Amino acid sequence: MSTFVVLDQPLSWRQVAAIAEGAPFVLSEAAQLRIRAARRLVESIVDKGIRAYGVNTGVGALCDVVVEPSQLRHLSRNIVMSHAVGVGPLLGRCEVRAIIAAAVNNFAHGLSGVRLDLVERLVSLLAHDWIPDVPAQGSVGYLTHMAHVALVLVGEGCVQRGVERRASADLLRALDLQPLVLEAKEGLSVVNGTPCVTGLTALACLRAERLLNWADVISAMSFENLHGQLSAFDAEGLALRASPNLSEVGERLRSLLEGSAILAASAGRRTQDSLSLRAIPHVHGAARDVFAQTAAVVDLELRAATDNPVVTGTEDSPRALSQANAVGAAIGLSADALGVAMAEVAAMAERRIDRLVNPLVSGLPAFLASDSGAGSGFMIAQYTAASLVAENRRLAAPASLDGGITSGLQEDHLCHATPAALKLLKILDNAEFILSIELLAAAQAYDLQASPLARAPNTDIVYRAVRNRIPHYRDERPLAKDIERARLIIREPTAVDFENEGASESGPPESDWHAQPDAAPEAKAPRSRPPRRRSKSSAPGKTANPS
């Protein structure tokens, strides 16, 4: 289980991602006080008859329609009901947890004005892992997804925990709770702001981080199998590009490939390799740059109050500020950018797969088949990778530019931030499959090398780990199942950490390659140092926990 999270100051993207994967969290006393204070401001606005958007007016193009005090509860409930218009497949457990965590973070700023009871019910949903049904489609920016979460609070909709599914009203009765009656402003606040795109992009950052680490490892395996020229990763040459991430990837690759007899035997054989091998540091390093920028934007978003309006001032002199802080332009653009970066990493991986299966350049049996001709080996797996690259190319078109006009010209500029985050997650899905295919192809290529020269110690660790789970392929079983198994390896958070190999007994314990893939330790940042060679005393097939 991930580290316990106390929501006091704004969460980081890493904390949101940890909560998404199951980490428990609670509101600090200070956060509770801020929420209560903001609620008193809303009550003061209502009592004083101050006109405030969504508090005592309609919403969207109906913003100038004043709502009578007796109808404010009705207004809040109606907002939730009318905004719960999502369609399509349901979001997964982690995605919904990430959205709710970001929403609670937004309320904890103490600028929205919802009651503490509402926020605590959201926290309780996650504590008991009851996941509201939230359809994936239907948002041009925000609103829809959180409206479906809010349905659960008022006794509508359904929730799920594992394989158990219940009507929200039944769950509330089982917990001896009454459906929440939404008060003034709560209907708007609970659907408003950028928690949806922020939560989804935080989760995407965690997945992208893990995938970038794996991309370095898997590309090193392909590089070794294809007898690449290590001079391409020479530190002096890479340092001429002023990019710390480029140099870091180069250092990781050198360390991963240190001690390779395969590469030692092929040194100087070619002047230079193809770009899918030679430019790994440049492409992976650039993708890491974009990742770092996106992660920073998510943290900025979590530190911002993204409700509209926000409430400030004092109980004697309250203010409701109607602006556009709920617009997710910054994070939508960042999600688009990270999607492009991860699509490029995956596209380069597909080119290496093609080189591994092509006997004209690999020096290996055609399509990595154990019996070429009678067996097709990885021929069609490369087709799958090419198909996923093509889909990613379509998905990488920026959602932020889609535009559109809604709500009677009142909302005449749309950022499509949530769609940007959703397609980023889909790009990551495809990239995981592509890199899984490359991992399998690289392991197969090691088996088929013409000479018995030794692999680098670090690539040997990964090869053995793969073979502990997935045997050599001989066309005797559906290859799709192997791809799924490889993807489970890639999704393990600890599986690529060589940094603490050979650590002393007082150091971090080793994790088992055979651990359940959905066990989620606290998320870790990209490695600032390259992997080190494994000590001879360490057992093969294991890696250390993240530091």
Feature roles, as predicted:
Residues 1-49, 76-134, 236-239:
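Glycine-rich, flexible loop motifs
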Residues 2-34, 38-46, 72, 146-147, ...:
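C-terminal auxiliary extensions adjacent to catalytic cores
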Residues 53-75, 82-105, 133-154, 163-164, ...:
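FAD-binding core of FAD-dependent oxidoreductases
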Residues 104-108, 124-132, 140, 155-158, ...:
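Alpha-helix capping at helix-to-loop junctions
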